[in-house]
Amino acid sequence: MGNANGKDEDAAAGSGGADVTSSSARSNGGDPSARSRHRRPSSDSMSSSPPGSPARSPSPFLFAPQVPVAPLQRANAPPPNNIQWNQSQRVFDNPPEQGIPTIITWNQGGNDVAVEGSWDNWRSRKKLQKSGKDHSILFVLPSGIYHYKVIVDGESKYIPDLPFVADEVGNVCNILDVHNFVPENPESIVEFEAPPSPDHSYGQTLPAAEDYAKEPLAVPPQLHLTLLGTTEETAIATKPQHVVLNHVFIEQGWTPQSIVALGLTHRFESKYITVVLYKPLTR
């Protein structure tokens, strides 16, 4: 049968070629030269003809450019490259890392249980999945406080075991506080706490009577460290303390002569100036 089909095709091709030739001959008045001019050139003549020859036919392998067209899709088929989210468990289109997973559970019976809340301005109602006697749903919500209510078999209800609030009309809805939970780990903050003071470093003994009988010091111990009575090199290298500024000091008996030295130290910005006045001791 394959050979028969091949013969039929060859015959059809031959007959088609004969029709073209005969029609061309008739249109040119039966001129043999015209018949030869309208005869299809062979592959050899096409290869030998110059590129600009009018007898050269266009190559069958050259196609016109086509504009890419989007593939057809069925009405019930999802669009290509589209990530399907579980709408019963996702309220927002945000990725999971931008929200906090939150589970709402209803365990007080009912066949058809749904929930609606302020996370989407009460626009949608999500159905809870039943597992045994409980109904639950998972939301991925941003941090914040939301109000919601449970619809059980078409009747609005709330969970009494969880925080709830009622409005002026008497409608009651639950409160959902969504926030990031950081578990407390006392061991992680021990190194930041100050070490406790030893108990033996403190006492509650009251001062004795002899402590009150002591006379106070005439001059504080800091005022004994003055520039008077020191060597010149030590006085230049030592920076005066702030407690000795603007105080007049007197030094006696530091020389064999009977001379009294009076000293006063001032500070001007970062510089210290000490003025020493020598006066003979009067008798």
From Swiss-Prot:
Which superkingdom, per the lineage?
Eukaryota
Kinase-interacting sequence (KIS): annotated span: 101-178
Q: Which Gene3D superfamilies match?
A: 6.20.250.60, Immunoglobulins (2.60.40.10)
The biased composition feature labelled Basic and acidic residues covers: 1-10
Task: Fill in the PTM field for this protein.
Answer: Sumoylated by SIZ1.
Instruction: Specify where it is mainly localized.
Output: membrane
Q: Tell me, using the record's free text, what induces this protein.
A: Rapidly and strongly induced in the dark, quickly repressed by light.
Expression tissues: Expressed in vegetative organs and, to lower extent, in reproductive organs.
Indicate yes or no for the key word Membrane: yes
State its location(s).
Cell membrane
**Where is the stretch described as Association with SNF1 complex (ASC)?**
215-283
User: Cellular component per GO?
Assistant: chloroplast; plasma membrane
Q: What UniProt keywords apply to this chain's record, in alphabetical order?
A: ATP-binding, Carbohydrate metabolism, Cell membrane, Fatty acid biosynthesis, Fatty acid metabolism, Lipid biosynthesis, Lipid metabolism, Lipoprotein, Membrane, Myristate, Nitrate assimilation, Nucleotide-binding, Ubl conjugation
Q: Name one GO molecular function term.
A: ATP binding
Q: What's this chain's function?
A: Regulatory subunit of the probable trimeric SNF1-related protein kinase (SnRK) complex, which may play a role in a signal transduction cascade regulating gene expression and carbohydrate metabolism in higher plants. The SnRK complex may also be involved in the regulation of fatty acid synthesis by phosphorylation of acetyl-CoA carboxylase and in assimilation of nitrogen by phosphorylating nitrate reductase.
Domain comment quoted from the record = Kinase-interacting sequence (KIS) is specific for the alpha catalytic subunit interaction and Association with SNF1 Complex (ASC) is specific for the gamma non-catalytic regulatory subunit interaction.
Recorded protein name is SNF1-related protein kinase regulatory subunit beta-1
The species this protein belongs to is Arabidopsis thaliana
